[in-house]
């Protein structure tokens, strides 16, 4: 069992009614009067729906045991993403709604880790940084420096990242997948 105060982004737990929930955001909130509460943005792993809720810090949940296996992203068709276990060559279908954020960081044939809850595939873990090519951005401004506020750039996967002014379309960039931010040129 894990207390609500110990839940952090990325953790998965099971509710009393059997729902498998992943924490997207968690923060302590101390109202002017009364006790501290935990405000959380959560995702139902099975349905993909997200919702905001709050818990008392002492509330307890059953922490889900999640196993991961190495895999490769194959392709996306309609509302399904296809992955292959690189050890057993088994293929898995995951609804896009469950991995839509992760798909912004990976290209076909990218290495990932598939997450299992028992025998049920529940998600995908992407590397901490990935290399993506800039598909579209505003033209560079002569004399632009790194200290500027930056500009939006659309990557080849559709991800929009704020980049320095000197970045141009066609350049490969290193992107932090946890924050969705520019790290450096590749």
From Swiss-Prot:
MF GO annotations: translation elongation factor activity
Pathway: Protein biosynthesis; polypeptide chain elongation
Sorted UniProt keywords: Cytoplasm, Elongation factor, Protein biosynthesis
Gene Ontology BP annotations: peptide biosynthetic process
Location, primary (coarse class): cytoplasm
InterPro entries reported for this sequence: Elong-fact-P_C, NA-bd_OB-fold, Rib_uL2_dom2, Transl_elong_fac_P/YeiP, Transl_elong_KOW-like, Transl_elong_P/YeiP_cen, Transl_elong_P/YeiP_CS, Transl_elongation_fac_P
SUPFAM superfamilies assigned: Nucleic acid-binding proteins, Translation proteins SH3-like domain
Entry's Gene Ontology cellular component terms: cytoplasm
Taxonomic superkingdom: Bacteria
UniProt subcellular location: Cytoplasm
Record-linked HAMAP family: EF_P
Homology family: Belongs to the elongation factor P family.
NCBIfam families reported in the protein's UniProt record: efp (TIGR00038), PRK00529.1 (NF001810)
Free-text function comment from the UniProt entry: Involved in peptide bond synthesis. Stimulates efficient translation and peptide-bond synthesis on native or reconstituted 70S ribosomes in vitro. Probably functions indirectly by altering the affinity of the ribosome for aminoacyl-tRNA, thus increasing their reactivity as acceptors for peptidyl transferase.
Name under which the protein is recorded: Elongation factor P
High-level lineage: Bacteria, Bacillati, Bacillota, Bacilli, Lactobacillales
